Amino acid sequence: MSAVTVRGVALGQGRPKIIVPIFAQTAADAAGQAAALGATAADLAELRLDPLRAGDGSLPDAAALCAAVRRVRAALDGRLPLLVTLRTGAEGGSRPCTPEEYAALLGGLLDAADAFELLDVEFAAVGQQLPALCRRAQAAGLAVVASKHDFAKTPPRAEMAAALCAMGDAGADIAKLAVMPAGPADAAELLAATALARSRRPALPLITMAMGPAGAVTRVCGGAFGSCATFGTAGVSSAPGQPDAARLRAALDALGGCLA
């Protein structure tokens, strides 16, 4: 697959990269988590903007979100690439907003494009606007991670592969898919869908995982099927089933060349 390289980290080349989430209700706490990431196994950081709240508990506007991004970048001190994610309630996040509000907030985040490298864009939320959003973000120097999450089930293999391919066809630099397995068979379906999508779009970097305990194996061995990154925690989890980043790094190192 073709690599997307950000701050010297090549997504789609070598072993799967470990993304560690920053998940906090205040910008100060988010910056504190960011400052501690240098001592972890993180290859990249993900700033989740959806849990952030203003001092009075209200939802921060785009300007406040941009300020939070800049504060986290300063705390990271240039050490790690930063993925910025505003996860909506419809896909497991804590930011209630309409599709129109979501698209407007993403557009507003481009004002801070010099402070991060990758922007998560929910495929279902933006729909036919994805190509235009990709072009705007890419013109601002960002790589786009188009994403789709299903917290209720694992769709059929063909449907999952088609979704990954569609995100790439719409202009995303990376396609991400997360599903909820009912058991090991569903986890295997997710891995098979990853391999199928990779065979159909060999140049498109993919990030895939099955969530929860039944999906844990996909977070470790996904690279063998075509996933270029996985999520691990450094004390704070942003999704069910995320393993400790240090233990995840040890597992990936043990598997070695099978995941390259």
Question: What is the predicted function of each stretch?
Answer:
Residues G14-I18, A41-D43, D77-L82, A115-E117, ...:
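Short, well-ordered coil/turn segments that N-cap beta-strands
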Residues A31, S58-R71, P99-L106, M160-A161, ...:
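Well-ordered, non-membrane alpha-helical segments in soluble/globular domains
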Residues A36-L37, V72-A75, L109-A113, A137, ...:
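Generic structural signal for hydrophobic
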Residues F123-A260:
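Catalytic alpha/beta core domains of metabolic enzymes, predominantly
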Residues M1-G32, L259-A260:
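N-terminal amphipathic alpha-helix/helix-capping segment at the start of soluble metabolic enzymes
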Residues F23, L44-A54, T85, T98, ...:
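Catalytic beta/alpha-barrel core
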Residues S58-A90, D111, L133-A146, A192-L204:
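Alpha-helix-loop-beta-strand connector modules within alpha/beta enzyme cores
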Residues Q25-G38, C97-L110, P156-A166:
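Short, acidic/polar
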